[in-house]
């Protein structure tokens, strides 16, 4: 194959032959045919062998997925990083709607190549850019201890100062990449509405002159950000957000984060998952108290889930303006019959969300001290008269299940839908 396919690491030796009827088709029809081709970038570029004109048609594909694990077991992509470089170079300055890069091996690309891809993406990708460095080894597992710097310079993924992409997803869980945010005062991501950052090293526990924090980047550079997802952040001791447009905030596996302070007047959904620091960077195996302060007068849905939570773990939850909340999800209640632990965040939310309509909770049996319980059957216990549906996930309650469910029904006298999921019952 010759022409524009030269230099393609994926180029084969076959040709289109003497008969080339495809080249006589109009551009609109060629683009329509291309839209039905797999979004796998390797497959898309291989269409260049079909005809003379098709050698350039693939460049107009609006969604490309690059993956170093997408090759068959009989043939592996020898130069993944070079192939991505070549494909972007062939496209030039043409815009594209979506780019996904999945890198499963450390030797698939250099940090310099990764940063060049990021610079290309935020300039040319209009809708979605997703970079996923997700290894299949145990180092990427959530239960594994986090990688440590040991004084060595970690490779850096640097976000450019300006971007026009609407949705950016950076999953750096495979390798210890440090995320560097743009320090320029003029940095702007005007079009960014969705941002997801997973397993990034922020190193905000160290004072560095001129470095921009995650909170400052979001507040100053992303005026239209509506959804923020932060998963397993490392070296991020505090997250102080002031975000006018933010509507959805999801935080998971906070490791060594000790303070979250969020003021978001348009926030509708707040989710917090696996928040105890069982894999803390600085004290692996030890829990660190987490203080969560949320000011969001329009908050409608709260989901707080931690299947590993113990009574001694300390979540200091301070959410202002709970009258607007209509949905509580993934709550944990520590119960013994009709008695419920009164030091738990789950009961605190039930007591302080009088207008909640849907409740999704997990029951857990605990032997509770007398001074730590509230009797849910007591006439002075709160009543949620607007609650209409409830989902209960029960495990290990045995003979206390019926009493516990009965007490919850008393708390929600106008309930019209109840679903109970029993786990571990033979």
Question: Which stretches of residues belong to each language-model region?
Answer:
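Leucine-rich repeat
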Residues: 2-245, 252-254, ...
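C-terminal closing repeat unit and adjoining cap/tail of repeat-based domains
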Residues: 3, 381, 411-426
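Conserved hydrophobic beta-strand positions in leucine-rich repeat
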Residues: 64-67, 99-102, 127-132, 166-171, ...
């Amino acid at each position: 194959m010759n022409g524009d396919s030269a230099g393609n690491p994926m180029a084969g030796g076959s040709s289109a032959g003497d008969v080339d009827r495809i080249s006589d088709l109009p551009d609109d029809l060629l683009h329509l045919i291309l839209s039905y081709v797999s979004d796998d970038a390797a497959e898309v570029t291989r269409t260049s062998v079909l005809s003379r004109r098709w050698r350039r048609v693939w460049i107009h594909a609006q969604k490309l997925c690059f993956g170093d694990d997408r090759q068959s077991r009989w043939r592996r992509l020898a130069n993944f990083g070079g192939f991505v470089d070549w494909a972007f170079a062939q496209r030039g300055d043409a815009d594209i709607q979506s780019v996904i890069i999945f890198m499963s091996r450390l030797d698939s690309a250099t940090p310099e190549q990764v940063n060049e891809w990021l610079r290309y993406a935020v300039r040319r990708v209009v809708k979605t850019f997703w970079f996923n460095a997700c290894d299949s080894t145990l180092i990427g597992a959530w239960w594994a201890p986090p990688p440590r710097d040991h004084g060595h310079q970690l490779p850096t993924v640097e976000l450019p100062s300006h971007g026009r992409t609407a949705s950016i997803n950076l999953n750096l869980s495979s390798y210890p990449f440090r995320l560097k945010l743009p320090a320029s005062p003029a940095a702007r991501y005007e079009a960014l509405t969705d941002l997801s950052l997973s397993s990034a090293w922020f190193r905000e526990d160290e004072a560095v002159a001129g470095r921009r924090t995650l909170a400052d980047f979001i507040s100053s550079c992303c005026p239209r950000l509506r959804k923020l997802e932060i998963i397993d952040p490392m070296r991020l001791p505090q997250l102080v957000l002031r975000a006018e447009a933010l509507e959805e905030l999801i935080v998971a596996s906070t490791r060594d984060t000790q303070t979250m302070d969020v003021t978001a007047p348009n926030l509708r959904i707040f989710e917090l998952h696996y928040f105890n620091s069982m894999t803390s960077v600085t004290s692996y195996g030890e829990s660190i108290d987490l203080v969560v302060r949320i000011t969001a007068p329009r908050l409608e849905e709260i989901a707080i889930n931690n299947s590993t939570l113990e009574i001694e773990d300390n979540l200091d939850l301070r959410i202002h303006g709970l009258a607007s909340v209509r949905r509580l999800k993934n709550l944990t209640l520590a119960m013994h019959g009709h008695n419920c632990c009164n030091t738990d965040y789950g009961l605190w939310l039930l007591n302080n969300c009088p207008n909640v309509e849907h409740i999704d909770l997990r029951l857990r049996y605990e032997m509770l001290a007398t001074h730590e319980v509230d009797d849910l059957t007591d006439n002075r216990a709160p009543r949620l008269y607007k609650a209409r549906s409830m989902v209960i996930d029960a495990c290990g309650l045995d003979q206390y299940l019926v009493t516990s469910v009965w007490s919850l029904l008393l708390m929600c006298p106008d309930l019209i839908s109840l679903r109970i999921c029993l786990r571990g019952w033979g």
